[in-house]
Amino acid sequence: MTNSLLTIGDMVQGVELPDADRQFWWDSLAPILSRMLQCSKYSVESQANILSFFKDFIVPSYGPRPSIGGEFFWKSYVTYNHTPGQVSFNFHKDKCTVRLSNVPTAPLAGTASDPFNQKGVVQTIKQIQKALPDMDITLFDYFSEAFLVADEDTVGLDARKPVPQYNQLVVASMLGYDFEPVPRVKVYFNPRWKALQMNTENHDLIWTAINNLGSPIKSYKRTLDLLQECGTPRQLGGWIFQPEFISFDLAENMSNAARLKLYGFTTKTCWSHIESIYTLDGRLNDAETQRGLAVLKRLWHLALSIPEDHDENQDLPPCPHLTAGVIYNYELRENSAKPEAKIYIPVRFYGSGDGKVIEGLVDFFKSEGWDELARSYQRDFVSVFSTPDGKMAGEHHDISFSYKNEHPYVTAYYRPELIRPMERHIV
């Protein structure tokens, strides 16, 4: 990463969009995205192409802007305060990739026409196909059919929700973008509304849909069998895995390694439980898994400012937020004998603030020999998220960790702070 930034005016200022909603999202997020791309040493041509893609296809998907008082049009807990997306840096050795995710929101979300905000993702994918015509949407079509509630079946379903906050807790769909530099699109589905409609368990619905894929899933069979085995505890009261939601890539050719990820969630935050998640409760005990576990433990302690003598069987101090806990996933790749575990360290819920998170990350980067990143990270964080009036327009939300090919992959996820609406955002 580097701090030799172009001026924001070179890329984003003066851009006029056709309506106040799009203008608000562009003015809020484009400066941050532009600075992230510059910090990550993307070429000027790549920056321009990515910002153009962002303007034409991602910005419209954010939907209606917040109210003048700051209330979001569609509230979802993809971040702790309903901000409908995140931006992130992915670090692997000396390479840094910029990523972005958001909850596509259609203008009729929350009405009888789209009570659970399902139409936004379908509309957005159709638009993106215009820019990426080689993108294979076979998996998208299959899983949207399996996981989204048909219009005629939505009637009366809202009245059956188990808790009042269900609409915010269940993020029915989300899109992610890896800028490599050509955008790689990832789809997330949480089928809880569909499971409610069908009177079945969410994890059973996910397993059924995956197993019914047929021939495309055969090359994942060994890994899938292992994960499904984890639905039964190895000992009384032991850890089990029940997928909460899934994600998959929309690759150019589905048979050419469209990664499939299964996500879990736990409110247990003691290290011994995290170790069980990472090793599938001891089912994975190979040398690479053990090396990755040791590196993860170091990052876990540094990012959360946990003393080395903290009891490994004791949960972290409780956080009252409704969504506080640990998200994790298992990535499936073709013909792989084991899944790749990823842990999302919840620094917003259990950390000690951005200053301590930065300090912990810098110490971790040093321990991995990522010297340039250790020198530049704090400076670049300030460069990306500082505003002209000296305030910060972003904060760390999660830090994810995975380990493959003998190297860690670390991603820092940030919640962007949106701007206050200006005159041109009010119509």
Swiss-Prot record:
| Pathway the protein contributes to | Secondary metabolite biosynthesis
UniProt keyword list: Transferase
Key word Cell inner membrane present in the record?
no
Annotated residues that bind L-tryptophan are located at 77-78
Asked if the Swiss-Prot or TrEMBL record annotates the protein with the keyword Phosphoprotein, the reply is no
Mind listing the GO biological process terms from this record? Answer: alkaloid metabolic process
- Residues recorded as binding substrate, renumbered to this chain, are 99, 186, 188, 259, 261, 263, 344, 409, 413
Q: Which InterPro entries match?
A: Aro_prenylTrfase, Aro_prenylTrfase_DMATS, DMATS-type_fun
Q: Which GO terms describe its molecular function?
A: transferase activity, transferring alkyl or aryl (other than methyl) groups
Give its E.C. classification number: 2.5.1.-
Q: Which leading EC class covers this enzyme?
A: transferase
* Family the entry assigns: Belongs to the tryptophan dimethylallyltransferase family.
The protein's role, per its UniProt record: Indole diterpene prenyltransferase; part of the gene cluster that mediates the biosynthesis of the indole diterpenes penitrems. The geranylgeranyl diphosphate (GGPP) synthase ptmG catalyzes the first step in penitrem biosynthesis via conversion of farnesyl pyrophosphate and isopentyl pyrophosphate into geranylgeranyl pyrophosphate (GGPP). Condensation of indole-3-glycerol phosphate with GGPP by the prenyl transferase ptmC then forms 3-geranylgeranylindole (3-GGI).
Protein name in the entry: Indole diterpene prenyltransferase ptmD
Q: Which organism is it from?
A: Penicillium ochrochloron
